């Protein structure tokens, strides 16, 4: 890679890392947030589904918008949504709701996860940036950085929880503040350092071709190889997301593990992901 491409590669990697880092911090402490306002396990499940469903719905449209308007502005838009969503979540958790109706903080939690999910296309856009700057023969190696970023975010995010979370009184002030600050830092880094990787000529071409996003999406799935690959990813992410979400709740509620202890299991997941993805 040329020096400017190396810099863009580093910027995209850091953008992806920071994006997943906030989620990795929130994952082990979200069950405790829900239990502050509702004792039902189903409520936590619905909260997780809200985020994942919103992300599933919005990501294809965000990818198409990045073709039409460029990678950089769409990435900034997504990060802005994350800042808003995590800020609402932080306010909900840190505010004293003792004299309020219980449904209000629950509504804000769901609203926060919905906004964060709808704007959760940073990973998809960063992946597209990596595709833009890498040659076909080096694309697989470059895409390996995505797995490294996910693994490293799992490792660092849960390390933050292990170090800063307190086992008493559901005190997660420092991890929540860290999770809130990271998207702001990410926005600043992208705004000043991440260049546009899609040429203006291609952006203008995409603007004229962009008519019906749903039609364009279904056109992609007419390709047999892409259809099979998408199905494989779909099955994998159902298993992985279900495992990580259920595991944390199971460890904390059924085995009475502390948040720090359950975060340690995700640290191991992060280490393995770094080794496997980096090695491949």
Language-model-derived ranges and their functions:
Residues 80-102:
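C-terminal ends and interior cores of transmembrane alpha-helices
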Residues 110-150:
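Cytoplasmic helix-loop-helix junction between adjacent transmembrane helices
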């Amino acid at each position: 890679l040329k020096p400017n491409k190396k810099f863009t590669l580093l910027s995209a990697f850091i953008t992806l890392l920071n994006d997943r880092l906030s989620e990795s911090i929130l994952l082990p402490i979200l069950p405790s947030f829900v239990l502050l306002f509702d004792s039902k396990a189903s409520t936590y499940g619905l909260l997780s589904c809200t985020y994942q469903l919103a992300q599933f719905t919005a990501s294809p449209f965000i990818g198409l918008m990045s073709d039409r308007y460029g990678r950089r502005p769409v990435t900034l838009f997504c990060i802005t949504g994350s800042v808003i969503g995590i800020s609402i979540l932080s306010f909900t958790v840190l505010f004293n709701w003792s004299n309020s109706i219980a449904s209000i903080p629950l509504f804000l939690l769901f609203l926060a996860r919905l906004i964060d999910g709808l704007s959760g296309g940073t990973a998809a856009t960063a992946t597209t940036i990596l595709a833009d700057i890498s040659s076909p023969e080096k694309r697989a190696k470059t895409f390996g950085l995505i797995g490294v970023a996910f693994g490293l975010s799992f490792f660092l995010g849960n390390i933050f929880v292990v170090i800063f979370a307190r086992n008493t009184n559901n005190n997660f002030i420092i991890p929540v503040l860290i999770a809130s600050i990271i998207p702001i830092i990410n926005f600043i880094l992208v705004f000043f350092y991440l260049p546009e990787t899609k040429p203006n000529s291609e952006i203008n071409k995409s603007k004229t071709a962009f008519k019906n996003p749903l039609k364009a999406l279904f056109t992609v799935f007419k390709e047999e190889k892409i259809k099979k690959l998408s199905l494989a990813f779909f099955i994998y992410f159902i298993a992985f997301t279900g495992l990580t979400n259920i595991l944390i709740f199971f460890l904390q509620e059924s085995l009475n593990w502390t948040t720090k202890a359950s975060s340690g299991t995700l640290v191991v997941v992060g280490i393995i992901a770094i080794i496997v993805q980096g090695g491949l």
